[in-house]
């Protein structure tokens, strides 16, 4: 058993599908692992409430943090409020295997700081256009796993998945990425396999 839980940071632009991915991961992993979640919202606990409503986990396993401020920095820069939430969950549920920390915005300095996250997943979506990967940035280039979500929208927005694939390979320089569609579950098993492999998770 891990002495400390694996902490996986999930970041990405507003509306990219972070909460849908967090829900899918909870539903898929809750029978395998001792699991909890921290969500970050600006002035509400909307993401936490969404997870509770959809019965992702028992409500006491989900802590919603209200960060204040603008959506692009919707996780405190020093990560202290999130670290306190993680500590609270550790005290509440001794022997946790995994804590998912979902950022409320696309600011990466705290979400992806080593003190808060052991592994980082960055979610973008196809509706933002097929040029997004080549624009780069820390999330696209440096996250441990990049998830390109909502691939079902590609025909509707005129996005080329082939172009996104080649641009992403170039920008990430060998780091892994996954195309996903949370509505159908496409890509979810690859994401889970990555978390288990890279995080050295072993199911009880």
UniProtKB/Swiss-Prot annotation:
Q: Where in or outside the cell?
A: Cytoplasm
Q: Which GO terms describe its cellular component?
A: cytoplasm
Keywords assigned by UniProt, alphabetized: Chaperone, Cytoplasm, GTP-binding, Nickel insertion, Nucleotide-binding
User: What GO terms describe the biological role, i.e. biological process, of this protein?
Assistant: urea catabolic process
- Residues that, per the record, bind GTP: 12-19
Family, per the entry?
Belongs to the SIMIBI class G3E GTPase family. UreG subfamily.
Its quaternary structure?
Homodimer. UreD, UreF and UreG form a complex that acts as a GTP-hydrolysis-dependent molecular chaperone, activating the urease apoprotein by helping to assemble the nickel containing metallocenter of UreC. The UreE protein probably delivers the nickel.
Q: Tell me which PANTHER family the record gives.
A: UREASE ACCESSORY PROTEIN G
Question: What is the recorded name of this protein?
Answer: Urease accessory protein UreG
Q: Which organism is it from?
A: Pseudomonas fluorescens (strain Pf0-1)
The organism's lineage is: Bacteria, Pseudomonadati, Pseudomonadota, Gammaproteobacteria, Pseudomonadales
| Gene for this chain | ureG
